[in-house]
Amino acid sequence: MTISVPQLDCPLSRPVHPEGERADAYAVEWLRGVGLMADEADAAPVLAVGLGRLAACYVDENASWDTLAFMTILMAWYAEYDDRAIDSTGAIDGLTDAEVAELHRALGEILRDRPAPDPSDPVQRGLADVWRTLNGLASDWDRAAFVDTTLRYFEANRYERVNIRRGIPPTPSAHIGMRRHGGHVYGMYILGAAVNGYRPERRVLDHAAVRELETLAANYTSWANDLHSFAREHRMGQVNNLVWSVHHHEGLTFQQAADRVADLCDKELAAYLELRQTLPELGIPLTGATGRHVRFLEDMMWSMVDWSARSARYDVVPEAA
């Protein structure tokens, strides 16, 4: 099943870190180093995904190499974890639902600064290295909030597996609510501040308008990704996709559903821009750490559109005759 992905116009782009291609190569080196990729495996498919180029959108244009390298290994870990634990018709690498729950428990231990329960597991070993690198790079950041969002990410992932096993897409409303957690977008907002060195005030982060701005940005980012990933996920038996949900529950063709999702993206972007414009009048000037936080929300929005369209991550491999 393929669709013609509607073009999204997201006029929020900015210059990115110039070493994205170097970071792509580093992703391969790191994946091999932690055992998530065999030494003899062809590097070309990973390079074509462009994990380093995506990471280059999430750090400051003049950020240090160490900052870009960290964001790159984070993107690499997310991709491998997602493929091994979530994106399958039931279980992948022999992982049952119970084993995924146990994996999540083990990953939670790592995030509490405890040794990996099974250091022979490359997923655990990879996260342990990501966590060590992050805590060596960032200081005075909201670790507790990040751990909380990550545990919710894992919970949403198990919800996704339930839907896959049933073979029934969730309703659009249910999908939208859980998708924000299942994509770990809120966790990325915290990491953006940690690695790029800005610290928005708590009063700003707790403001109703800023929280809603984050929700609008998270929705746009998630839905744009759903549009581009639909064909690949459909082939893999995934049902946790807004295109699938709209098709199944609203009786539209897949193309009509994709067009509907694109329209929802456009409306969410318009609402985001409208709300952003009001922030200064609410006592939240878009300067300093606040302005940088808002900039990161937008980096995730536009880069998801740009990277998803260019990356081989969502290419569909034709079925064998």
From Swiss-Prot:
Coiled coil: none annotated. Gene3D superfamilies: Farnesyl Diphosphate Synthase. It is an enzyme of class 4 (lyase). The keyword Metal-binding applies. A motif (NDxxSxxxD/E motif) lies at residues 225-233. It comes from the Bacteria. It catalyses: (2E,6E,10E)-geranylgeranyl diphosphate = hydropyrene + diphosphate; (2E,6E,10E)-geranylgeranyl diphosphate + H2O = hydropyrenol + diphosphate; (2E,6E,10E)-geranylgeranyl diphosphate = isoelisabethatriene + diphosphate. Contains several highly conserved motifs that are important for catalytic activity including the aspartate-rich 'DDxx(x)D/E' motif and the 'NDxxSxxxD/E' motif, both of which are involved in complexing metal ions to coordinate the binding of the geranylgeranyl diphosphate substrate in the active site. Terpene synthase that catalyzes the conversion of geranylgeranyl diphosphate (GGPP) into a mixture of diterpenes, including hydropyrene (HP), hydropyrenol (HPol), isoelisabethatriene and traces of isoelisabethatriene B. Hydropyrene is the main product. Some other diterpenoids are also produced in very low quantities. This is Hydropyrene synthase.
